[in-house]
Amino acid sequence: MERGRRKVRIGRVVSDKMDKTIVVAVEEFVRHPLYNKRVKRTKKFKAHDEKNICNIGDRVKIMETRPLSKDKRFRLVEVVEKVK
């Protein structure tokens, strides 16, 4: 029997100032319930970057994991696109 699926998100790194931690901004479009307009919503997640390989501006894929600290609930899966 398989446990629940883990959430996977793709976003941009907005901060890498902490050791082994990055802040990833994930954008999504949601439909307004009354006006039916698509609204862009941005949410920030702290993610575990074990090897400190990410820089600001990188597109990364993060996956939900067990709580690693007070705020960290995601870990880095891969760097989709490096910033130039």
Curated annotation (Swiss-Prot):
Instruction: Give the CDD domains listed for this entry.
Output: Ribosomal_uS17
GO cellular component terms attached to this protein's record: cytosolic small ribosomal subunit
Q: Some GO term, biological process aspect, for this entry: which one?
A: translation
Entries under InterPro entries matching the protein:
NA-bd_OB-fold, Ribosomal_uS17, Ribosomal_uS17_bact/chlr, Ribosomal_uS17_CS
Matches recorded under SUPFAM superfamilies: Nucleic acid-binding proteins
**Which stretches are annotated as coiled coil?**
none
Q: Which UniProt keywords apply?
A: Ribonucleoprotein, Ribosomal protein, RNA-binding, rRNA-binding
- Molecular function in Gene Ontology: rRNA binding; structural constituent of ribosome
Please, which domain of life does this record's source organism belong to? Bacteria
Share what the entry says about its subunit structure, partners included.
Part of the 30S ribosomal subunit.
The role this protein plays is: One of the primary rRNA binding proteins, it binds specifically to the 5'-end of 16S ribosomal RNA.
**Family the entry assigns:** Belongs to the universal ribosomal protein uS17 family.
Protein known as? Small ribosomal subunit protein uS17
The organism encoding this protein is Clostridioides difficile (strain 630)
Q: What is this protein's gene name?
A: rpsQ
